[in-house]
Amino acid sequence: MKINTVLFDLDGTLINTNELIISSFLHTLHTYYPNQYKREDVLPFIGPSLHDTFSKIDESKVEELITSYRQFNHDHHDELVEEYETVYETVQELKKQGYKVGIVTTKARQTVEMGLKLSKLDEFFDVVVTIDDVEHVKPHPEPLQKALQLLDAKPEEALMVGDNHHDIVGGQNAGTKTAAVSWTLKGRAYLETYKPDFMLDKMSDLLPILSDMNRS
C-alpha cells in the first residue's frame, strides 16, 4: 500500500520546544514545591498530557498547576523555541509532492498555533488535532483517527512521525506506519525499543523513505 499521508507530532519533532517545556515544569514545580524537583526529574513528564502529569504530583492542585505552567510557557515561548534543521524544507516538499500532512499533538491549540506561526509551518498544515479536539490522547488511537478522518485518509496509507513512545504506539494502535526521530530527548535507543518502522536522523530522511515505499 502506498503512503499518501504524513502525520507529525509537534513538540520535539517539528519544533524544538524541549527547553521551553523543561523550564515551564521547573518554574511551576519550584513555585509550589520549592527545591523538590531537578531537571532530570521532569524529563519523564515530556509526552503525557499536563493533566496526567500533574495528577500524579498533586491531584488537588491539577488545574492550578496547569494554569501556572501554561502562563510561563506562553510568556517565554518565542525566546525558548528553536527550529530543527531540514524540517521546513521537508514539509514544504511533501506538500509540493501532493502528500496530505497533518499534526497530532497533546498540546492546547493556542500554544500549537504560537509554535506553528513562529516556525512559519502554519501555511502547510490543513489539519491540526490538539488535546482540545479529543477525549483521549496518544497513545490512544483517537487523535490519529480524527486526523485521518479529516484528511480523508486511510491508516494503511499513512505514516506517523514522532519523538516519543506515545507517537509510535499511537501510530501502531491506529494502524499506520511509524517513524521515530533520533533527535528525541529520550534517546534513540529508548525509541527503538518500541519498534518504529523507520528511524530518522534528520527530517529530510523522510523524502527518500517515502519515495522507496511508494516505488515498491
UniProtKB/Swiss-Prot annotation:
CDD domains, per the entry: HAD_PPase (cd02616)
GO molecular function: inorganic diphosphate phosphatase activity; magnesium ion binding; phosphoglycolate phosphatase activity
Matches recorded under InterPro entries: HAD-like_hydrolase_sf (IPR050155), HAD-like_sf (IPR036412), HAD-SF_hydro_IA (IPR006439), HAD-SF_hydro_IIIA (IPR006549), HAD_2 (IPR041492), HAD_sf (IPR023214), PGP-like_dom2 (IPR023198), Pyrophosphatase_Ppax (IPR023733)
The UniProt record lists the keyword Magnesium: yes
GO cellular component term, pick one: cytosol
Active site: 9 (nucleophile)
Catalytic reactions of this protein: diphosphate + H2O = 2 phosphate + H(+)
Top enzyme class: hydrolase
SUPFAM superfamilies: HAD-like
Record's keyword terms, sorted: Hydrolase, Magnesium
BP terms from Gene Ontology: DNA repair
Cofactor(s) needed for function: Mg(2+)
Keyword Hydrolase: yes
EC number: 3.6.1.1
HAMAP family, alphabetized: Pyrophosphat_PpaX
Function, as annotated: Hydrolyzes pyrophosphate formed during P-Ser-HPr dephosphorylation by HPrK/P. Might play a role in controlling the intracellular pyrophosphate pool.
Similarity comment: Belongs to the HAD-like hydrolase superfamily. PpaX family.
UniProt name for this protein: Pyrophosphatase PpaX
